Amino acid sequence: MPGLNGRRVAVVAGVRTPFTKAGTALKDVRAVDLARYAARELLERTNLDGQEVDEVIFGQVVPSPLVPNIGREVSLLPQFPKEIPAYSLNRACASASQAITAGHDQIVLGNAAVIIAGGAEALSDIPILASRRLADILVEASKAKSLGARLKAFTKIRPKDLVPVAPAIAEPSTGESMGQSAEKMAKENHIAREDQDRWALQIGRASCRERV
């Protein structure tokens, strides 16, 4: 749709990697690899010169501590200019959609002409955290000034401290996941399931028309 300055934004093409269950066919593939595969394939299918891309934006719900900015990593592919900006964002389940929206806004505002935006997730590659108590003990040991003090810190470790902690899905403040919050909002605003399905169908049909 056109912005206030008359610039019209279009989604030219899109690609997606296969969906598989965590720990199966793609268990050795990281989220950043999936994002790079998709970006390269997009350029290949559209014959787009990567040098024409002005910005890269990617959404990710559970980023890896080893790859904190997945958008930046995608932008470092040799196909893209070295000087383009790139960043990542998190809006829970809507992270990829938010990345696309952010790209739209950049084009409308005249800050870019071509943007690659999307999202990537690999549940086989999510960070598994240590317990807070174990983390505190490890920090204490790292600051110890002698071997004896370091060993003394390690003696505080208990078996329960070694139990891994998976990333939280629910918000710590509300105890609700994004899906639960959405259901709650729909109920409070009297949005029937049929209306939601009708809207989804309308969007799907519009998307198909745009591709014809």
Predicted features and spans:
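Short glycine-rich phosphate-binding loop at a beta-alpha junction
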Residues: E52-G59
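Glycine-rich phosphate-binding loops at beta-strand->alpha-helix junctions
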Residues: Q60-L66
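Mature N-terminal segment immediately following signal peptide/propeptide cleavage
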Residues: V11
